[in-house]
């Protein structure tokens, strides 16, 4: 059997009701004209009576006098109850459907320069939490409908957009405004699924920046060759930090705390800022910039990244005479109080 949508059913019901209504109006007029002394003498009178009856207004200025006309009057009266019930029910269904579509993300989002996260896991939650604390907007795509309620409870709609979609439906990612995102974090269950997904999604969205975490560090080059910008091994990072705790615990603790997002104005963090055309340090030597930032804002410049061709080259603690150029990314250690000043001086916010 062909499945008919609710909207098509509603249209068919409306046409059927209209046909029955017209038939009853003409039948009413016929009964009343045969009666001879009825107040319903024309089609307009019959229409007027039917309308005030169906809308339950019931002015009582004209009423049928024939037996057949009264029977039709009863039919109009009962129809009015049914029509109201159906209209209220259909209206409730439409509102419910709109709310459900909004909850599932079917209306799309207008987020710009946000992060799209494909897949929902407990590890992904910790990443998303950090991003939102940093003031970034996130679009989360999940194919598990059971996650939708939880995600809406966890995150404010101004910070996170939730999209229910099959991962294979790449067209649906347009609803997450993927073309205008800053990066895509592929957060699927295993490395094989991630690699297959990367190969498929890059056929449609080739120019986006993709990020993955790996269970197997040996696959890093494979993912880079597939077009991933950053492939990070969770085990590799954790093992380095753990080893550091074993022989230089203070360094390990410093590293862990400096990577965490600050909560108070006195908490420190490493941030990167792009050097825009209005940046006051363009054309200035590295050492002079270092001392000026430290003295004026209590900010430590620890390095910079420069785009050289298709690659980004990290310069850790460059030579003193290294000249800062527009488009560079300055890597800075600062607290939240200093960040507010740097945002204003650099005319930009942290990030890429």
Regions found by a protein language model. Name each.
Residues 1-22, 30-40, 52-55, 61-64, ...:
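Cytosolic regulatory regions of ion transport systems
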Residues 43-47:
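Structural signature of hydrophobic alpha-helical transmembrane segments
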């Amino acid at each position: 059997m062909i499945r008919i949508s609710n909207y098509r059913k509603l249209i068919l019901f409306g046409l059927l009701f209209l046909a029955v209504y017209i038939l009853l109006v003409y039948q009413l007029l016929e009964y009343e004209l045969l009666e001879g002394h009825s107040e319903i003498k024309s089609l307009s009178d019959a229409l007027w009576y039917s309308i005030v009856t169906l809308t339950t207004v019931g002015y009582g200025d004209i009423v049928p006098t024939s037996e057949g006309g009264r029977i039709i009057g009863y039919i109009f009266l009962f129809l009015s109850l049914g029509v109201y019930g159906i209209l209220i029910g259909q209206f409730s269904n439409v509102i419910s459907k709109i709310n459900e579509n909004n909850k599932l993300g079917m209306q799309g989002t207008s987020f710009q320069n946000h992060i799209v996260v494909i897949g929902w896991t407990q590890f992904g939650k910790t990443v998303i939490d950090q991003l939102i604390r940093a003031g970034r907007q996130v679009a989360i795509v999940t194919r598990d409908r059971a996650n939708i309620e939880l995600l809406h409870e966890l995150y404010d709609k101004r910070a996170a957009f939730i999209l229910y979609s099959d991962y294979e439906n790449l067209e649906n990612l347009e609803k997450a405004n993927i073309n205008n995102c800053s990066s895509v974090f592929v957060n699927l269950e295993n490395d094989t699924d991630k690699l297959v997904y990367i190969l498929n999604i890059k056929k449609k969205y080739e120019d986006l920046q993709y990020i993955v975490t790996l269970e197997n560090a040996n696959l890093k080059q494979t993912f880079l060759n597939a077009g991933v910008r950053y492939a990070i091994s969770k085990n590799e990072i954790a093992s380095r930090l753990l080893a550091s705790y074993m022989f230089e615990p203070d360094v390990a603790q410093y590293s862990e705390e400096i990577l965490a997002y600050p909560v108070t104005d006195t908490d420190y963090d490493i941030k990167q800022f792009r050097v825009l055309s209005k940046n006051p340090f363009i054309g200035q030597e590295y050492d002079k910039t270092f001392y000026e930032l430290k003295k004026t804002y209590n900010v430590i410049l620890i390095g910079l990244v420069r785009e050289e061709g298709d690659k980004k080259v990290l310069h850790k603690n460059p030579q003193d005479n290294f000249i800062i150029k527009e488009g560079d990314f300055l890597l800075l250690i600062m607290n939240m109080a200093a960040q507010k000043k740097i945002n204003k001086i650099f005319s930009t916010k942290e990030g890429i």
